[in-house]
């Protein structure tokens, strides 16, 4: 196993691992990195040496692969993924991968899974799962919050093409809406440059203004808002909380939880919003329970920072009915085996699973195969712009072609 420092889509250093087998097969995997991260995520190890890439270099994580991990994995069978991941867990010995770094363990774990597939002469998704479906994309089209330099508080406004017959159709519906949104923004003399995840980041002041623009773009595309294409939000409320437990979601001023819930109710009745991710902060369990109880029958309530792909936190959320869906980011937990365990736990509880990229992503397309292999209903991997996002869509199109008529779109 070899580690090296490479770069993500923001130009920040990140970790790549390359696994070599004795049959001559090798494969690489790269860890992504988030901007709005949950406090309970597995630890991303950076050197913190201000003289090297302003503290962002990952030489320690790379050295952990080359000096600590590599020797422990000698003579392992690459098909024994859970054994390999267990060795990584024991070697690290902490709750959240503080010693080795989740960026080191994940890169090794995923590179091994790719080697196993190559050895078995199978596509990665076929090596990971037995039954398959193609996920419906949640495509980011307007950015705010930590992903943009505008006044929008909600971090992501996304579209989901619910009436798509196949994956190419899903992409086409999103493409048409994006092109129409671009024309609308241009007609209003607004900027159409894109944010970290490929969505537009125009200087819009209110959530409602963004939602109106998206509805108009859907209608201009001869599609029905709420039927053909629905709107999904990622509020990233962790970033919008003050010390009194109030949130600045509606505007710059802060409001208590009950007012925020009423605001969400108003938005979901006025606009075709079918999914809200991180509507409240990661420790505000009561607020989560309230919102799920209030709108959860018609709206997907998605835990990202709440669950951080962690089985203990998901277990609490299932018991307390805090949400009805989970965002799955392998780098929040740090190994493939633990990621698969979380997906399986969520499915048993009838939670929807949404496989997700990070805002600092790379050309690695592992999550596309993961979404298909786990029959996850949705994938969240940015807009139809920037190669690190489009790479995932292109991979899903190849998978759709490989499976042919045997595969259907997942059911929401």
What do these predicted regions represent?
Residues 1-15:
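Short, Gly/Pro- and small/polar-rich lid/capping loops
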Residues 32-118, 122, 126, 171, ...:
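Metal- or metallocofactor-binding catalytic centers and their adjacent structured scaffolds
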Residues 208-412:
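Catalytic core of soluble alpha/beta enzymes
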Residues 15-23, 27-33, 139-161, 233-240, ...:
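Short beta-strand elements
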Residues 132-195:
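Mobile "lid/hinge" segments at catalytic clefts and subdomain interfaces of large enzymes
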Residues 7-10, 93-110, 137-149, 194:
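Glycine/serine-rich anion-binding loops at beta->alpha junctions
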Residues 156-167, 191-207, 236-250:
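Active-site-proximal beta-alpha loop/turn segments in soluble metabolic enzymes
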């Amino acid at each position: 196993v070899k580690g090296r420092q490479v770069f993500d889509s923001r130009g920040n250093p990140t970790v790549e691992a390359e696994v070599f087998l004795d049959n001559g097969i090798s494969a690489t995997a790269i860890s992504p990195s988030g901007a709005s991260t949950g406090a309970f995520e597995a630890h991303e190890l950076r050197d913190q040496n201000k003289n090297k890439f302003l503290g962002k270099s990952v030489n320690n994580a790379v050295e952990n692969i080359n000096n600590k991990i590599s020797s422990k994995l000698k003579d392992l069978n690459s098909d024994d993924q859970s054994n390999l991941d267990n060795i990584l867990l024991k070697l690290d010995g902490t709750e959240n991968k503080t010693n080795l770094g989740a960026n080191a363990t994940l890169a090794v774990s995923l590179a091994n899974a790719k080697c196993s597939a190559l050895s078995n002469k199978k596509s990665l998704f076929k090596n990971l799962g037995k039954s398959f479906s193609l996920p419906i994309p949640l495509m980011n089209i307007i950015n705010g919050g930590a992903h943009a330099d505008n006044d929008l508080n909600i971090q992501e406004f996304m579209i989901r093409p619910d009436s798509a017959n196949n994956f190419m159709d899903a992409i086409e519906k999103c493409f048409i809406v994006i092109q129409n949104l671009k024309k609308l923004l241009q007609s209003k003399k607004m900027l159409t440059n894109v944010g970290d995840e490929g969505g537009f980041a125009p200087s819009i002041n209110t959530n409602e203004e963004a939602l109106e623009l998206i509805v108009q773009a859907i209608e201009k595309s001869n599609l029905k808002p709420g039927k053909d294409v629905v709107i999904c939000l990622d509020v990233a409320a962790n970033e919008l909380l003050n010390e009194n437990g109030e949130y600045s979601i509606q505007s710059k001023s802060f409001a208590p939880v009950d007012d925020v819930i009423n605001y969400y109710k108003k938005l979901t009745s006025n606009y075709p919003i079918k999914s809200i991710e991180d509507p409240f902060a990661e420790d505000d369990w009561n607020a989560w329970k309230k919102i799920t109880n209030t709108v959860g029958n018609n709206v997907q309530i998605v835990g990202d920072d709440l669950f951080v792909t962690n089985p203990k936190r998901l277990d609490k959320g299932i018991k307390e009915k805090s949400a009805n869906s989970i965002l799955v980011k392998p780098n929040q937990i740090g190994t493939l085996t633990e990621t698969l365990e979380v997906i399986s736990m969520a499915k048993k509880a009838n939670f929807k699973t949404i496989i997700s990229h990070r805002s600092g992503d790379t050309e690695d397309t592992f999550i596309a195969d993961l979404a298909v292999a786990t029959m996850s209903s949705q994938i969240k991997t940015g807009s139809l712009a920037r190669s690190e996002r489009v790479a995932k869509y292109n991979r899903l199109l190849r998978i759709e072609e490989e499976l042919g008529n045997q595969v259907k779109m997942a059911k929401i």
